[in-house]
């Protein structure tokens, strides 16, 4: 069965934590296809944020050394509101016989009940939840715990060979980097070069982003 990983985020900007996490996931799971899925930014956003086009360009630059990582822009291309359930339905229509796995952080798991039509997500894809080991001990909403009790399975072979319906918790390592922190540091003219791919850093400086 063809296995597809979908790593969604605003990537504003994409940073070394995103890349290292993805490399760790691929080293352990070996998905046949791995997509970075840039999400739409909120309609009302600070002017210091990058445009959709700039975020995609930074992703292209960051992923140049990794040809197996692809970019999927279907959320950005959609004129209507972009909900993950719609995105997964679109993937499922395109890849009817493939295993789909949505990669989210543990914070995403905790807020899952706030997602639009969140109950449908597990029927459309598997969930790969990434974060540090200690965060796995945090209390979860009752509805999420019920979901974990029913669908959790940390066997990667189950994840790779089932169309949907499994939740795997995985420690991909700890990288103390966030796009929010990088934007704040750039605004304060602090050095962030070590946290960004070189080509992305050069692009940000050339475009004058996040000032």
UniProtKB/Swiss-Prot annotation:
Record's keyword terms, sorted: ATP-binding, NAD, Nucleotide-binding, Nucleotidyltransferase, Pyridine nucleotide biosynthesis, Transferase
EC id: 2.7.7.18
Pfam families: CTP_transf_like
GO biological process assignments: NAD biosynthetic process
Pathway in which the depicted protein is active: Cofactor biosynthesis; NAD(+) biosynthesis; deamido-NAD(+) from nicotinate D-ribonucleotide: step 1/1
Reaction(s) this enzyme catalyzes, per UniProt: nicotinate beta-D-ribonucleotide + ATP + H(+) = deamido-NAD(+) + diphosphate
SUPFAM superfamilies given in the database record: Nucleotidylyl transferase
Gene Ontology molecular function terms on file: ATP binding; nicotinate-nucleotide adenylyltransferase activity
NCBIfam families (UniProt xref): cyt_tran_rel, nicotinate (nicotinamide) nucleotide adenylyltransferase, PRK00071.1-1
Recorded family membership: Belongs to the NadD family.
Descriptive protein name: Probable nicotinate-nucleotide adenylyltransferase
